[in-house]
Amino acid sequence: MGKKKIHKRAIIVPDIHFPLQDDPAVEVVLKAIKMVKPNIFVCLGDLGEWKSVSPFKYKRRRRPPLEYVIEDLQKEVDAVEKGLDRFDKVLKSVKCPEMHMIEGNHDNWLNFFVEEYPYLKKFRFENAMHLAERGYKYHPYGKYLKIGKLYFYHGGHYTTTYHTKQHA
């Protein structure tokens, strides 16, 4: 007898950018999860927009006092968690056994912020989103996720117009 093939169903979702998400698109994905009942769910990075800690927000100006930044950041964390709750609810309802969170370049901005303020570890992406408690396998920015013969990677390293101009 031949080896029995195992078929897995997966849903891969890139670049949601909560709280700036496209709600109709999110609803379509949530319906797809209900229909497909995936064995695997992969968030392919940029779960949040993280405008409050964007390296571009204060490019030519000084950042305001930390207490103002933290207030904005906490609001953004709450909004992104609320968005992730929507996915978690549906994934739990279909009993999805394997969930992966790949850190995107926007998500990594939280880590850069914590590098500046090491006593704020609760704002590291993995911690702020409570990924372990939610049941996600966390994959840091720049690391590949391999499932079977497939590799998953966020990228985002060459997204500037400078790179395009240099390689056109």
What is the predicted role of each segment?
Residues 109-168:
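Acidic, His/Gly-enriched loop-helix segments that form or flank divalent-metal centers
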Residues 1-2, 31-32, 161-167:
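Short, flexible, glycine/charge-rich loop motifs used to bind or transfer phosphoryl groups or to couple energy/partner
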Residues 4-6, 29, 133, 140:
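Short, flexible coil/linker segments at or flanking structured domains
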Residues 18-134:
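Core catalytic region of metal-dependent phosphoesterases/phosphodiesterases
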Residues 12-14, 40-46, 98-104, 139, ...:
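Active-site neighborhood of phospho(di)ester-bond hydrolases with catalytic His/Asp-centered motifs
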Residues 1-23, 148:
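Mobile, glycine- and charge-enriched loop segments
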